[in-house]
């Protein structure tokens, strides 16, 4: 998969792409990230990309010319959708990550300052928000999207089942995880996980996943694909279905 990232700070991505799963994805040729410096498209002799807002107000606004030219440069290479990272966008979810992972190539536009000139919306295809809070720029949000999407691409994770069992994969939060030692400061690993009975382990994990979701994110249960056994378990916990 190819990501075209339009940004004023391409160097910010060098670290995240040089470690862990993203690094391995690049090495396996499962991921390619083209870092495109918006400033390179500015026609201003000082390479300015921002100016004061019409009507007054605090801060600066990213100018349309460099953004239009940068986006048109990307779109000239094919039918590539451009998504603007913005707090006004559609909330990024695991479901959205899954849909994006099926695409061959997408572009992410990272805003800065007080945002972009409104006319730039004419050449973008959508907006993505990673939550109801404000960041200095879209770079961190773009990194979140790239990471979440990349781990869903076939062949990226060493154990594909990991992606299926993680939180939000089926609108349920993940079950508790344990590793060695068996006892730490008086706290023991649940006996069922040591039993070797895979059916009982799977049942325990499913019930713990349901229990944790009910406790921390009950809103997700309305979207989850629940079995009759799941529903019975939740009713016993006081959840009305």
Curated annotation (Swiss-Prot):
It catalyses: guanosine(37) in tRNA + S-adenosyl-L-methionine = N(1)-methylguanosine(37) in tRNA + S-adenosyl-L-homocysteine + H(+). Pfam families: tRNA_m1G_MT. S-adenosyl-L-methionine binds at residues 111, 130-135. GO terms for biological process: tRNA N1-guanine methylation. The keyword Transmembrane helix does not apply. GO terms for molecular function: tRNA (guanine(37)-N1)-methyltransferase activity. Its EC number is 2.1.1.228. It is an enzyme of class 2 (transferase). GO terms for cellular component: cytosol. InterPro entries: Alpha/beta_knot_MTases, tRNA_m1G_MeTrfase_C_sf, tRNA_m1G_MeTrfase_TrmD, tRNA_m1G_MTases_N, tRNA_MeTrfase_TRMD/TRM10. The keyword tRNA processing applies. Keywords: Cytoplasm, Methyltransferase, S-adenosyl-L-methionine, Transferase, tRNA processing. It is found in: Cytoplasm. HAMAP family: TrmD (MF_00605). Belongs to the RNA methyltransferase TrmD family. Homodimer. Specifically methylates guanosine-37 in various tRNAs. This is tRNA (guanine-N(1)-)-methyltransferase.
